[in-house]
Amino acid sequence: MEIEVNETYRAQFCVIGGGMAGRCAAVAGARRGVKTALVQDRPVLGGNASGEVRMWIRGAGHHFPFYREGGIVEELAMANIRYNPTLSFGVWDGVLYDLAAGEKNLKVFLNATCTGAKEENGRILYADIWQLTTYKKLRIFAEYFADCSGDSILSYCTSAAFTSGREDKARYGEKDGVSAADGCTMGSSCLIQVRETAEKVPFTPPSFARKLTEEEFRYRMDTNSRGVFRTDNFWWMELGGAKDVTRDAEEIKTELLALAYGVWDYIKNSGKFDSDNWTLDWVSFLGGKRESRRVVGEYVLRQDDLVSGRH
């Protein structure tokens, strides 16, 4: 039996995906007087930058302070300093939510995922949304839609063109590209955070943890520096690039969790690190994707755009 639509919502602008790109797009639209709907399939906003994944917004600004993002992203950073001086990720989620839900022209739908869309004459009329927490099927009508979902789910549900993997070097004249196109992408990560305590803390790994050898580990962390793990965010725990990052997401996450617990097991129990007083404080059970489907727009960014320096 097909589930009937429980509610409809009419907006001028509908953004699918509440990561940083979608959140900023929705806020920008709302501030310009546009009635906007923001649809996010997680309970929090921010995507990879949320408390669920915990990858800070950095980029070139990490190395060159004057290269960092301005605009709404800088506004978020300033608000975070004011409301979250200890840089708690849980409080950061609240900052992200406050600076969206507080916009009078913006309606935020959390725990809501796009399941389909209706097109007519090359335009999207509405998107169908399933909200997990309320078990409601919502239908959002809008004049304009933005696919900021990361997995390009709106494009997948419509006739919009999208691609994934690596193009061959001849397609866009990229000299450092691969000779033949393939499905390889950047991988995903389940990050961990560790914390120092006042006394020794043992660690017993779960049964699913992967056992790592010194040979495997030495290429990722300098075992000659016994305290190096203290300032590491473990971004290098990356898997899945040779698999389908969307269809195989749960399988990849399972492997990542085994790796994450295995890495901490090695740090705690190998004797190679000064980690006696350190404890595992948090593990992400949501794989943070570096890459997925890519919507094909009016212009495709290519290697020459980045290396030529003309911009």
For each predicted feature, which ranges?
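Conserved N-terminal/central alpha/beta ligand/cofactor-binding core
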Residues: 2, 6-10, 28-35, 39-123, ...
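Flavin (FAD/FMN)-binding glycine-rich loop and adjacent Rossmann-like elements that form
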Residues: 48, 111, 123-126, 133-311
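A generic local structural motif
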Residues: 1-3, 131-134
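Residue-level signal for short segments within beta-strands and strand-turn junctions
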Residues: 40, 129-131
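Short glycine/serine/threonine-rich phosphate/pyrophosphate-binding segments
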Residues: 22-25
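Glycine-rich Rossmann-fold phosphate-binding loop(s) that bind the pyrophosphate
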Residues: 17-20
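Short, charged helix-to-loop "capping" segments that act as catalytic/coupling loops
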Residues: 103-106, 132-136
